[in-house]
């Protein structure tokens, strides 16, 4: 939690509505400078099973999650951002489903909350409440798949996935760490399920959210996807997954280029320069196939960027 004083009470109240003797709450205060620390301390004093982890300096969401992982002692781990909340009984429902299915992890629906509007968003899984192979949730390249649902808090993960020191969030990434993590999860785990559960509420449009920033932190999707490409190139099933990785990287570049005028001028210039270099780093044959099969608007934009041509 970092400077979420406006939302901390409702977030922590939702945890109280999920309290159980077998559930521990690890509250990570990432060096907040507003009212967040006081709210967290007051709540933790009243709630058995709650532990406060305090960072002496702001380290970012990746390290905050890693600190929670390292301190966790339960059989399952899940995450909640400081401005979001749970419906009553959500965590117990997740645990019941995992106990019944016996899979490594499960993803869930979530409720997108924009002001007073509520919309249920579902992961693009082929079936619900059945155990599947996570690798089957990555491809094909031209379809929306489970790796396109990067909300790590919309899920629950068995402890053993983290026990070897793996499945930590990349702390060098200030944004897009969730996208890389979800890909690695699907490459590493052996079984998963998509649950018909929608008890986590995602507060959209918060001014302080990392999704709203206009500075260079937005550009961390580039090193995130560079790392992903390296993972896929080392994987035994490179040919199966490389087209999806390249296409998703291209889609992210096109998305950010499309809104570059909203960014700080120096960030927009750096975006165009680094995105061009990223396109030249991609496997050439796979990139050409991607540009051929993408929609014409994005394909033209990416081709112009790669070749150094200006828009007509």
Positions of the model-derived regions?
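Solvent-exposed aromatic/hydrophobic patches embedded in short alpha-helical segments
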Residues: 156-157, 249-250, 254
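Inter-helical turn/loop segments and adjacent helix faces that build the functional surface
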Residues: 169-171, 235-239
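Catalytic core of nucleotide-sugar-dependent glycosyltransferases
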Residues: 190, 197-206, 211-237, 252, ...
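Short, hydrophobic secondary-structure boundary micro-motifs
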Residues: 121-122, 241, 288
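Membrane-interface aromatic/basic loop that binds lipid-linked glycans or pyrophosphate carriers
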Residues: 22, 32, 259-312
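Nucleotide-sugar donor-binding/catalytic module of glycosyltransferases
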Residues: 1-222, 226
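Short, charged, amphipathic alpha-helical segments
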Residues: 239-247, 269
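Short, conserved alpha-helical segments within structured domains
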Residues: 177-178, 245-249
């Amino acid at each position: 939690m970092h400077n979420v004083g406006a939302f901390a009470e409702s977030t922590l109240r939702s945890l109280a509505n999920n309290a159980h003797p077998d559930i521990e709450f690890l509250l990570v205060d990432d060096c907040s400078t507003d009212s967040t620390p006081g709210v967290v301390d007051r709540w933790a004093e009243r709630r058995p099973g709650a532990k406060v982890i305090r960072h002496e300096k702001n380290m970012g969401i990746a390290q905050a999650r890693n600190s929670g992982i390292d301190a966790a002692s339960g059989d399952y781990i899940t995450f909640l951002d400081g401005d979001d909340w749970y419906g009553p009984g959500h965590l117990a429902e997740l645990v019941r489903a995992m106990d019944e299915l016996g899979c490594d992890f499960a993803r869930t629906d979530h409720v997108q909350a924009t002001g007073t509007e509520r919309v249920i968003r579902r992961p693009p899984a082929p079936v619900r409440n059945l155990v599947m192979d996570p690798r089957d949730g990555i491809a094909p390249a031209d379809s929306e798949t489970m790796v396109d649902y990067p909300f790590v808090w919309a899920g629950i993960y068995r402890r053993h996935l983290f026990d070897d020191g793996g499945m930590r969030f990349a702390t060098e990434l200030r944004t897009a760490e969730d996208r890389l993590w979800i890909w690695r999860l699907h490459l590493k785990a052996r079984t998963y399920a998509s649950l018909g559960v929608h008890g986590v509420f995602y507060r959209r449009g918060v001014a302080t959210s990392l999704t709203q920033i206009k500075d260079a932190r937005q550009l961390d999707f580039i090193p995130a996807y560079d790392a992903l490409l390296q993972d896929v190139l080392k994987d035994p099933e490179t040919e199966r997954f490389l087209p999806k990785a390249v296409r998703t990287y291209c889609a992210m570049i096109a998305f950010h280029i499309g809104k570059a005028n909203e960014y700080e001028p120096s960030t927009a210039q750096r975006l165009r320069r680094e995105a061009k270099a990223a396109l030249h780093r991609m496997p050439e044959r796979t990139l050409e196939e991607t540009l051929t099969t993408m929609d014409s608007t994005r394909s033209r934009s990416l081709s112009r960027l790669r070749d150094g041509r200006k828009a007509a």
